[in-house]
Amino acid sequence: MKRYQMYVDGQWIDAENGKVDQVINPSTEEVLAEIQDGDQDDAERVLSVAKRAQSDWKRVPARQRAELLRKFAQEIRNNREHLAELLVSEQGKLYRVALGEVDVAASFIEYACDWARQMDGDIVQSDNVNEHIWIQKIPRGVVVAITAWNFPFALAGRKIGPALVAGNTIVVKPTSETPLATLELGYIAEKVGIPAGVLNIVTGGGASLGGALTSHRYTNMVTMTGSTPVGQQIIKASANNMAHVQLELGGKAPFIVMEDADLEQAAAAALHSRFDNCGQVCTCNERMYVHSSVYDEFMAIFMEKVQNIKVGNPMDPESDMGPKVNKRELDHMEALVAQALKEGAQLLHGGKRLTEGEFGKGFWFEPTILGNVQQSMTIVHEEAFGPILPVIKFDTFEEVIDYANDSEYGLATMICTRNMKYVHRLTHELECGEIYVNRGHGEQHQGFHNGYKLSGTGGEDGKYGFEQYLEKKTFYVNFD
């Protein structure tokens, strides 16, 4: 069993309190590694380091910062298989998905590097004679990045890239459930020569370490991917210092199948968008609405695909779905299904834990489909974040838009239709930040990953996401 330390100021150190935590393999329930369980004392130490390092890092020309980060991204690619195996063992995702996650982390960083020469300001006309107004973009300072357990490595890359290219320093706190691949970034940073204190990685509890990081006076920005309740706590904590906050939180994405949809294409997209990473993606198909005129035909196609899902060892290339990440999440799956059946839903497939044979250890749950679902049911409104899908009939476009908007979340929506009138109406009528038309979920780096309502604030990716890591400074220059 490997014992990990925290990466602070270019060194590997223990938590001040001497406490440690364990990382569990969700496929086998075996202890994988021991990590540091840091608290507020470690927050004070690492933020002091990051603040000091930022004064030098921001003076490095942006192009040079980007060149160093391209080496960092390439070294991530050089360690692709090792990092992917770590992700499988700590999170339970399929090996091929883990390989993709490593690639995405590297490409997030490479994409951010493309912005090194595009942090453009403005020259604005003044109302006064012989005066110019300059608006410059500058780094915010110290960024605290808190990442979720579902795609910990990709999320680290998503935040490290723009933060460092923009001239900030960063403190990354991965969740204690899946921190191992992220901690390996410290070794990679050492190898490529990222200056001490520019990239720091710490581990510990959300309330103790996370709370101290987000509320500290040295923290200029908090970027977090995780649950809505945690995001709400971060907003409160960061208000003490008026730090800039960027949050990507929960979701309850609807998948809409219109009467004119290509049903085979829609079924394939719906399947991938629900069971990808065991349903543990913020933009997953959480509630599926199918037009009544094509319901029977569509469900026949869709259910055949569901029945062919192979749950199994995530290292097995024949497996289609791995385990849930922990027992708490597994218990949540059981509770949601029980509540749905109590409220009148019909179990069409799955609905229980897998416990026999190879599933004797680990956190396994069947792909689950619920029919006879009404809009008012709990399963339609509470985020599952797992392999459970309620299916609801609808009759008109207006009805399904009302259903889709009937949620406290507003991250993503997927719709399958050939009618561009429907698509254009979504611009004005749908209350969410991302819309996928005739395809499953999965955003791109140059887009903008942005949630409405309780799904977040600030947004990530693309030019709008990169600008989150920059402040503006205005000069009124009189040259009389």
UniProtKB/Swiss-Prot annotation:
Catalytic residues of the enzyme: 248 (proton acceptor), 282 (nucleophile)
GO annotation terms (biological process): gamma-aminobutyric acid catabolic process
Parts of the chain that traverse the membrane: none
EC number: 1.2.1.92
Enzyme class: oxidoreductase
Lipid metabolism as UniProt keyword: no
GO cellular component: cytosol
Annotated NADP(+) binding sites: 149-150, 173-176, 226-227, 249, 383
Known uses: Could be used for bioconversion of red macroalgal biomass into biofuels or industrial chemicals.
Keywords, comma-separated and alphabetical: Carbohydrate metabolism, NAD, NADP, Oxidoreductase
Keyword DNA repair: no
Domain of life: Bacteria
Any single Pfam family the record assigns to this protein: Aldedh
Matches recorded under InterPro entries: Ald_DH/histidinol_DH, Ald_DH_C, Ald_DH_CS_CYS, Ald_DH_CS_GLU, Ald_DH_N, Aldehyde_DH_dom, Aldehyde_DH_Superfamily
GO MF assignments: succinate-semialdehyde dehydrogenase (NAD+) activity
Catalysed reactions, as listed in the record: 3,6-anhydro-alpha-L-galactopyranose + NADP(+) + H2O = 3,6-anhydro-L-galactonate + NADPH + 2 H(+); 3,6-anhydro-alpha-L-galactopyranose + NAD(+) + H2O = 3,6-anhydro-L-galactonate + NADH + 2 H(+)
Record function comment: Involved in the degradation of 3,6-anhydro-L-galactose, which is the major monomeric sugar of red macroalgae. Catalyzes the oxidation of 3,6-anhydro-L-galactose (AHG) to form 3,6-anhydrogalactonate (AHGA).
Family: Belongs to the aldehyde dehydrogenase family.
NCBIfam families attached to this UniProt entry: PRK10090.1
Protein name as annotated: 3,6-anhydro-alpha-L-galactose dehydrogenase
Organism: Vibrio sp. (strain EJY3)
Organism ancestry: Bacteria, Pseudomonadati, Pseudomonadota, Gammaproteobacteria, Vibrionales
Gene name linked to the record: Vejahgd
